[in-house]
Amino acid sequence: EIEVGSIEELHYYEFSNALREGDVLALAKIDREDLQEEYPILIHLATPVLLTMMDRMMGGEGEPDDSLDPDYKLTDLELNLYADIITDMMAFLGRSWENYITLNFSYVRTETNPTLVQLIGYDDTVVIVGLDIRFPNSSGRLSMCLPGEMLTNIFTEISKQTGHRSTGEDKSEEIFDSLRDSDLEIIAELARTKIQLS
């Protein structure tokens, strides 16, 4: 079960400072010609939930490991599984926008030490979407960091498309008005019968 837990507008450094040295970030991008974004979308999945998902992928029960070290570092195999999980999530992320705009998200790479990498301007505005994930025996959080400039560009594109749609709607209204005002002869046959006269 997944539901939106929070949406916050922050500066990037507030998101970055909340990450620990052992945290892993997935970087994603939008594949769309008119929205070539230089800033990545950052995705952070809490390690306990991530390990539960991996265990279930490998046929396990997804039992949480209560003895997990807070500074646990993912193995190479786990990093590959992490990339697979994020790649699958990208398809669903695109579907969440499809009523407004067609966006295709794709996985770019994984950062194993995000505290040393400046991916977005330190003072840039970002929107953090927190998704609460619940399994029968585990729960945790997935956080998506969406650059404010990217969202502004997306909303601008949506506004343009809405403007084009309303123009099309105006023309269709004109067409219907001219059809209503036109003269049209209608002949209808209600029934046919045969009568014998004998």
Regions found by a protein language model. Give the residues of each.
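N-terminal auxiliary interaction/assembly segments of multi-subunit proteins
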Residues: 1-198
